[in-house]
């Protein structure tokens, strides 16, 4: 419990310190992937909801089709879509699931799919673009992954000339009647 509280306390500074490098990486990647019409976002365990959120953000502001999947489900259909023009954004944190995520990345690459891997320092990955973000305690990696994915979506949209402040067909709030 003490370890988690200490890690949580340090997160704001850790995120603040990481943001400039995240923006720089997102700006570097956006022209390289701007011609893609679709993206996969893959994650396992705690990273699966992050993959869903990353795909949603890319769709919302860049208008690029994106789907988030649990990495383990990739072989149940989505893998058929992988090709050189269909990049994959893989969340590959240094946790117990890393070997399985790495295996999924290799599967994508075997089908000539380009991979951006968002990973922690020391990740043993050989991908087209390894995007290293600082490590955080356990599930707190999410707090560092989310801004990176949001900046990637933002920079993609900006590079493509989209209005990032007023995405088309989106309401600022949702009401249920």
Which residues does each predicted region cover?
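Glycine-rich, anion-gripping cofactor-binding loops and their flanking helix/strand elements
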Residues: 73-107, 136-150, 158
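Short alpha-helices
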Residues: 1-6, 127-177
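Residue-level marker of positions within ordered structural domains that often coincide
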Residues: 63, 113, 157
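Glycine-rich phosphate-binding loops that contact phosphosugars or nucleotide phosphates
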Residues: 1-10, 91-134, 152
């Amino acid at each position: 419990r003490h370890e988690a509280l200490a890690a949580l306390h340090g997160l704001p500074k850790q995120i603040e310190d990481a943001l400039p490098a995240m923006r720089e990486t997102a700006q570097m990647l956006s022209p390289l992937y701007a011609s893609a019409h679709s993206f996969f976002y893959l994650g396992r365990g705690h990273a699966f909801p992050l993959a869903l959120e990353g795909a949603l953000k890319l769709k919302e502001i860049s208008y690029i089709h994106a789907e988030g999947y649990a990495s383990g489900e990739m072989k149940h259909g989505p893998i058929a879509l992988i090709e050189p023009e269909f990049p994959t954004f893989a969340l590959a944190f240094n946790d117990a699931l890393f070997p399985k995520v790495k295996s999924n990345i290799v599967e994508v690459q075997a089908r000539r799919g380009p991979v951006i891997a968002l990973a922690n320092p020391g990740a043993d990955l050989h991908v087209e673009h390894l995007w290293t973000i600082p490590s955080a305690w356990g599930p707190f990696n999410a707090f560092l992954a989310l801004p990176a994915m949001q900046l990637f979506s933002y920079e993609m949209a900006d590079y493509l000339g989209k209005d990032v402040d007023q995405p088309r067909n989106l309401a600022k709030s949702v009401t249920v009647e």
